[in-house]
Design a protein with these regions (language model features):
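Amphipathic protein-protein interaction modules
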Residues: 66-119
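N-terminal domain-onset segments
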Residues: 1-83, 124-154
Length: 154
């Protein structure tokens, strides 16, 4: 109950919603379509669960907060543990921007964009390419290090 109240306050302060914005949906669908068939089906079942999109950093980092994730919907295999990033190149006119879909411990965790959400409003966006990006830089990794410190295993 408190989760819904908290999400309602975020909604009223324009920091989140219960639905994806068009550029978020385009990026997420492109990333999930890149996954092999069985993993794509599992990931799509995850995002069919009820969730709230919490947007941080001006909409650059939308994170999915699931209310009740079915434990049987975790992605298995190499993408089932740790952080993985599916890189989606978005074409907006002549510009190319790299967005990411973040998988964390087998769950579709959120998205990352290099520009604030307002940049994408009313923009004509196409998907250029999709690949799995295992680079160390991501907004999610920066936030994780800020909260938990640097992992001594790296």
């Amino acid at each position: 109950m408190l989760g819904y109240l908290s999400d309602g306050l975020r909604f009223l302060s324009f920091e989140g919603s219960w639905s994806l914005k068009p550029h978020e949906a385009l990026t997420l669908n492109a990333a999930l379509a890149w996954l092999p068939g069985d993993l794509e089906n599992t990931a799509r079942k995850q995002i069919a669960q009820r969730f709230f999109v919490e947007r941080m950093s001006g909409g650059r980092v939308p994170c999915f907060r699931y209310y009740r994730m079915d434990p049987g919907l975790k992605i298995e295999g190499p993408l089932g543990s740790g952080d993985h990033f599916i890189n989606v190149v978005l074409k907006i006119g002549r510009r190319r921007l790299n967005a990411k879909c973040v998988l964390h411990d087998g769950v579709v965790f959120g998205l990352e964009f290099p520009k604030p959400g307002s940049f994408f409003k009313n923009a004509d966006i196409e998907v250029g390419s999709v690949s799995c990006d295992e680079t160390a830089f991501s907004y999610t990794a920066v936030l994780d290090r800020a909260e938990h410190g640097i992992d001594s295993g790296d």
